[in-house]
Amino acid sequence: MPWSPLAALSWALVLRLLALLWPPGRGEACSCAPAHPQQHFCHSALVIRAKISSEKVVPASKDPADTQKLIRYEIKQIKMFKGFEKAKDIQYVYTPFDSSLCGVKLETNSHKQYLLTGQILSDGKVFIHLCNYIEPWEDLSLVQRESLNHHYHQNCGCQITTCYAVPCTISAPNECLWTDWLLERKLYGYQAQHYVCMKHVDGICSWYRGHLHLRKEYVDIIQP
């Protein structure tokens, strides 16, 4: 594909935006806003299951003045859950080379499969970073795997609010309170692994595990 200013601008803009999140002196850590797996699905342009075949460090663009580097992962796509209208069979995904810009390190040439969520840039390349939801497929719960096919997509009209301390309240009927951090001091706890924020016919959203309503202890603890 010939180099174009628009394509170079896309890469430059993404990398600069990531760099702005980590000003000088903050260190090498990558920080991301918390998001439930359902939110990751709804906010991503592409969601696929894939194996990683190889990796290669490449320039971010063909512009000689651009010194940014990317890791290009060659993948074998197993299944696409979202992004059909923008892409068909994905061969490569790209991530920042620098860990300070949230570059993702994936295992290559192994039997491990990944769930990858990411964005599709204006030049058609798929871009992923640590603030996306990227997990080994074997670590996903049965509810998460099933929800990738239907429930996440069907309930993107629901809003998920992270609860850090009690009391937590919702401000709209289409909100669900995400309490994993409050109860377990980790983001991807029981609620993230086993529940979906689903909308009723009356427009009200609440947590469901398959056909089961959210366990009572989750409801009790968020009451003022």
UniProtKB/Swiss-Prot annotation:
The keyword Signal applies. It is found in: Secreted. The record marks K69 as: Involved in metalloproteinase-binding. Its main location: secreted. Residues 30-156 form the NTR domain. Keywords: Disulfide bond, Metal-binding, Metalloenzyme inhibitor, Metalloprotease inhibitor, Protease inhibitor, Secreted, Signal, Zinc. InterPro entries: Netrin_domain, TIMP, TIMP-like_OB-fold, TIMP_C, TIMP_CS. Complexes with metalloproteinases (such as collagenases) and irreversibly inactivates them by binding to their catalytic zinc cofactor. Belongs to the protease inhibitor I35 (TIMP) family. This is Metalloproteinase inhibitor 4. It comes from Mus musculus.
